[in-house]
Amino acid sequence: MESTQQMVSSIINTSFEAAVVAATSTLELMGIQYDYNEVFTRVKSKFDYVMDDSGVKNNLLGKAITIDQALNGKFGSAIRNRNWMTDSKTVAKLDEDVNKLRMTLSSKGIDQKMRVLNACFSVKRIPGKSSSIIKCTRLMKDKIERGEVEVDDSYVDEKMEIDTIDWKSRYDQLEKRFESLKQRVSEKYNTWVQKAKKVNENMYSLQNVISQQQNQIADLQQYCNKLEADLQGKFSSLVSSVEWYLRSMELSDDVKNDIEQQLNSIDLINPINAIDDIESLIRNLIQDYDRTFLMLKGLLKQCNYEYAYE
């Protein structure tokens, strides 16, 4: 039979579920939104760690196994546990653990007075009332029976000194502090307003400068477009005039066609390219003229003629 082990496991699982319910209900009362799965996971991780690291789970399950073995007629483990609990070494070890816990509490700021008071008294809240009930524990009862409780009359007979508070002077002090704070806030606010106005003025001035520059850019763009259109018209007129003049010349058709092809290759849309094309055409004409002059010069020499520039 493992009924005791199953009961202990059930108690541990129920404790975990109670911890989850306590955590979620506390969050709901505080008005904090939460994810149930996340709370469940975090509480389970912490609960399992504490139960395993402290050895509480293994201790409870071990005692449950011992009880089940005793119920099944196996008393060896129970006898060993009884002997272990009554051994002087075990008692010394328990005293050592208790002393360690006391020193740990002292290091955390929980002194002896607080430990004794917490062990002797507990407070029970009354629902719906601001008052509460102070309950004495069994330790307090034992101390009373042993005569370890005394009444200090000095706390009862001592008269409470009532300090007279000058609320008017306090109010005046608070009013002065409030006025001083109000003045500082007002000065800071006025300074901030002045800075904001200055920033706005600078912004408006910058906007005006940008607007003027944009207008100038638009005027320059318009002028450039007009200049480009005029140049395109001039180049187109130039090409037409040269073509008309070329047709009136007594040159051969091949020469005319060659010059017309060069004229038609001029880019009339982009003035920069048009200037480059005209420069190339003029260079070609000068080169043709130079070749013609050299041919004429050679013919004159062959005919024994001389030439001179006038």
From Swiss-Prot:
Residues 167-231 are annotated as: Interaction with host ZC3H7B. Residues 1-146 are annotated as: RNA-binding. It is found in: Host cytoplasm. Residues 163-234 form a coiled coil. Keywords: Coiled coil, Host cytoplasm, Host-virus interaction, RNA-binding, Translation regulation. One of its GO terms (cellular component) is host cell cytoplasm. Plays an important role in stimulating the translation of viral mRNAs. These mRNAs are capped but not polyadenylated, instead terminating in a conserved sequence 'GACC' at the 3' that is recognized by NSP3, which competes with host PABPC1 for EIF4G1 binding. The interaction between NSP3 and host EIF4G1 stabilizes the EIF4E-EIF4G1 interaction, thereby facilitating the initiation of capped mRNA translation. This is Non-structural protein 3.
